[in-house]
């Protein structure tokens, strides 16, 4: 995985996901990503690409709720998409919020390859802090 930052959009998988998001005009793509990741709750292992996409999806959901993290060049495409779609959303969906929380728990768990890869790097604590900040923002 090409990674250049600990943020949710600082890797190739997340950037590819964000590119695909541009084709969507509603919450379907975000929810589909979360549903795919949650299948790992039963398969016992979450592979890194799905973990990276999950973080991108949850951060995008967070931005739609007005609880987004820092904007930067890595998030620019997502930020444009959020600005276009946000006004069209009728109300927050508790089911997606619940899925987002479950996904973050899974990404941080022992069953996450993404967590394992970050654990083997010198930036693990920074990455973990980024994910726990996202959890905090979702809960606010």
Q: Which sequence ranges carry the predicted segments?
A:
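Low-complexity intrinsically disordered segments
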Residues: 92-140
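Short, hydrophobic/amphipathic alpha-helical patches that form generic packing surfaces
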Residues: 52-66
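Short, solvent-exposed secondary-structure capping/transition elements
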Residues: 63-77
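Residue-level signature of the C-terminal ends
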Residues: 20, 24, 64-67, 107
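Helix-start/N-cap signature of alpha-helical segments
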Residues: 46-50, 93
């Amino acid at each position: 995985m090409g990674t250049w930052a600990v943020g949710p959009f600082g890797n190739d998988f997340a950037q590819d996901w964000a590119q695909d998001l541009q084709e969507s005009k509603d919450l379907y793509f975000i929810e589909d990503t979360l549903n795919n990741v949650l299948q790992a709750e039963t398969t016992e292992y979450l592979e890194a690409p799905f973990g990276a996409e999950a973080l991108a999806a949850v951060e995008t959901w967070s931005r739609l709720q007005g609880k987004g993290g820092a904007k930067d060049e890595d998030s620019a495409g997502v930020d444009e998409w959020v600005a276009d779609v946000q006004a069209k959303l009728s109300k927050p969906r508790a089911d997606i919020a619940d899925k987002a929380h479950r996904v973050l728990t899974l990404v941080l768990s022992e069953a996450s390859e993404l967590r394992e890869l970050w654990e083997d790097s010198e930036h693990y604590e920074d990455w973990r802090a980024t994910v726990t900040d996202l959890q905090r923002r979702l809960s606010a």
